[in-house]
């Protein structure tokens, strides 16, 4: 097993300089629209579709330490302060002209966390958690560059796999790249995840630490939620808010495996269309996640 995966995981850790930010909500309360599941096929490229379909993944890793902490709920909220790590471009770095406003993302993040039972600490309320979040793009190499630098191109794939499904999925995909004969799982979900790791994507990462541990310079990860979306045919202004909205069902909830999701985005809004969850077989209908 290559040693690259633990090294790659370092980029997900919180920085030493922590700036506490509490955003004041200023958008409509309705940030998510759910409905019955369906999948629509279009011959038009995403860039020309009125409501382009988003191909997303969601995953949360929970540490043993995190399992000892209180579970957040609407009745028993967990309070936090937040550090905005900002935009981070990775892989074959590309310049993006359409980037969402930091204040808009902070607002949406606060409200999606609230749906999951996490509230910002205000006034005398002491925070239990320090949340660190950052977002950006992770792009693959073009074929010519990948031929010249195959090892670096491979490392980029593993980095994207880490964002998609954590160390276990990154390790499994690494083994498949080393031995293509191991690729025996060609279910809809398995192919979806593999394609996601091979292609350009946008991502959002939210990591949770116990606030007192950070204050004493002994941060230990509690949980980390990572969301990705294939970036072809959509810009960051469309992709990032959608990821943050969908993350509400993943914060602080351990994932046994990465979730593969398809959903359309309503152009010009932050509302999402019906959700389709891809299972390890033919796609099936499933209730939309709770608001």
Could you tell me what each predicted segment is?
Residues 8-19:
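Bacterial N-terminal signal peptides
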Residues 22-104, 125-129, 133-146, 272-291:
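A structural "domain/chain start" motif
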Residues 24-25, 186-192, 196, 205-259:
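Short secondary-structure boundary motifs at beta->alpha junctions and helix caps
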Residues 76-78, 116, 127-129, 200-205, ...:
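Envelope-exposed proteins and targeting segments
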Residues 89-101, 117-119, 192-195, 227-234:
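Second-shell loop/turn segments in exported
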Residues 115-128, 255-263:
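Surface-exposed patches in mature extracellular/periplasmic domains of secreted proteins
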Residues 134-214:
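Surface-exposed short loop/turn segments
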Residues 243-291:
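Compositionally biased, intrinsically disordered linkers/stalks adjacent to structured regions
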